[in-house]
UniProtKB/Swiss-Prot annotation:
GO annotation, biological process: positive regulation of DNA-templated transcription
Name of this protein: Regulatory protein NosR
Lineage: Bacteria, Pseudomonadati, Pseudomonadota, Gammaproteobacteria, Pseudomonadales
Disulfide bond sites: none
NCBIfam families for the chain: TransRegNosR
One Pfam family matching this protein: FMN_bind
Organism: Pseudomonas aeruginosa (strain ATCC 15692 / DSM 22644 / CIP 104116 / JCM 14847 / LMG 12228 / 1C / PRS 101 / PAO1)
Amino acid sequence: MRALRFSAGSWRCVFAWMLLLVGLAAQGAELSELERLRIAQVFPAVERIGDPEGDYGVRRLSKGEETLGYAFQTLSVTDIPAYSGKPINLQVILDPQAVIRDAYVLEHHEPILLIGIPEEKLHAFSARYDGVRADQRVVVGRSSDPQAVTVDAVSGATVTVMVVNEIVMRAAHTVAVALGLIEDRGNVRPKPAQVRQQPAATASWSELLGNGAIRRLQLSRGQIDDAFKGSEAEGIGEADAAHRDEPFIDLYSALLNPPAVGRSLLGDNQYRELMASLKPGEYAFVVLGDGEYSFKGSGYVRGGIFDRVQLRQFGDIISFRDLDYQRLSDVYAEGMPEFREMAIFVARASQRFDPGSPWTLELLVRRQTGPVAGVFTSFELACQTPEEYLERPQPTAEELAALEEAARPLWLRVWYQKSFQVGVLCTALVLLLAILFLQDRLVRRPRLMQRLRTGYLAFTLVYLGWYSLGQLSVVNVLTFVHALFEGFRWELFLSDPLLFILWTFTAASLLLWGRGVFCGWLCPFGALQELLNELARKLRVPQFQVPFAVHERLWAIKYIILLVLFGLSLESLALAEQAAEVEPFKTAITLGFDRQWWFVAYAVALLVVNLFTRKVYCRYLCPLGAALAIPAKARLFDWLKRRAECGRPCQLCARECEIQAIHPDGRIEANECHYCLDCQMTYHDQDKCPPLVNKRKKRAKSAPADNARIPAENL
């Protein structure tokens, strides 16, 4: 029996240790080793990391009783979507002065960073927030606000780092406000307004009520009872059903400093005396009440402070003491009702009252729950000085520009920052439209057309691709499809202005002419292939044509790749983004071949093959081209002209088409055509197009003889 007792005690001990270990493991699961490491690096002396507290899961970092700082995850505070459509999660560490000590990326789904730009660059960017206060303004790039902190973007991931900036600063500010470390932005004081002192005509009571100079708060006994429901004072002194609508208090208040208000209510003599008693920066308020409840009470008699009325502005409470109170014996406004209580209260200069900003008069109602205990509830009367009584300081041009810039949403700030690139791109697209609409005239001048096209391809590669990073991707298509089913947000697609404009133009051109306009003119990687192949031809590199029967069947590969990527995206968009590396765009265009060797080898291999057979990748492997080809069947226009002889018997255009988009029977395959317009130059060339050459020869034979050119011996 003794042994049994020992065994039971041992099991209790083991069970207690198991509970302790489970608790520690649970805490460790909540706070990862990486988060602990970052905290230890910032605060090496930290002894305790508290549990998540409050709405934002903030952990208190302490050494003994001293608070060293606070740590939290941004995903608990804000979920702003990044370029991938999903939020980025960071751990942010604040010190007690609301200074950011660390911001570290814990999780992201950005495709350019998953496979592309090294993550170290993103961590290096987030490290720049060390030393920034939570109430400072941080701008990625340049800013017209001289007070703003500016940080450089990460090349190739501008949108991502702008979202990171928004996430870090918004989350840090929100948490710092919740912890009481800084003021709420909504409570930040503007430059105070001044009351106009010009003489003004007096107004009646109804006129002052009408323009908002006097504000009114009416409360019934039933409203008071309802306010105490759920508290310890519920049911104490409640009115029965017959008396719920009886008035509890009818309260009025106004700022007396404006002459039109003060003279109307107090009369000229009393108003002058009141203004003479006020020091600069002091403001007087009239409070008038009727009903069973006294807004003055009797507390000020015992303690010298009025405990039933107070003002609140910018989150600050303005309380009134007996020295701030003046008796008011009479009010002179025409049509004014009678009041049981009247008083004037003065806000002192040290309380920094601003007559130009909204404020509230709070009425506090107390119910006794014990000999000395009681419960308070408050009722607010919103007040605002009419604009005609105020003079506001004019902001400087720099302040206006800073305010305008700060008020812009994130996507609009990106557009402003890239306004030059947007302007150049829009100009280039207008030029492309002009080429398309004037194609019949331009193709009659082959040399001009070829130079124009070569120049446009060089612009697409160098400026649009390598400089502006305007390379569309099948990832954009997958993201768009998922957004349609998971909550479409325009901000996500507007966050990159160049891609948004390109996609808008591409979508319109698909409906009008098919995929060829984008693939042949606006794809930087396609332009790179075409320019390299042109150079290879000039260097007499041999060219190989795939037999058309084989070529036609190889078209299916890109559609299969597209279906595989779409299927993967249904399981995991991040997995599909990684599989989309079948596109060499990131390597060759976005990152300029600055990647791991295997990515570079893949892109270079495609370009080497392209030297011998033009645009092999575009023809057979490009999932983006496949996605654009699907809606091409619905195109509205077919401006590529053909003749009856095309394909039967003439095969010139089919042989010359460098991507083999013309069937042997002469039909142009719209799903494969890149709209290079070479066939149209041949179509209009009377010295090259066989049907035109034959017609010219026939006309020459049937033309009447010219006697002046017949030799004399033949006459």
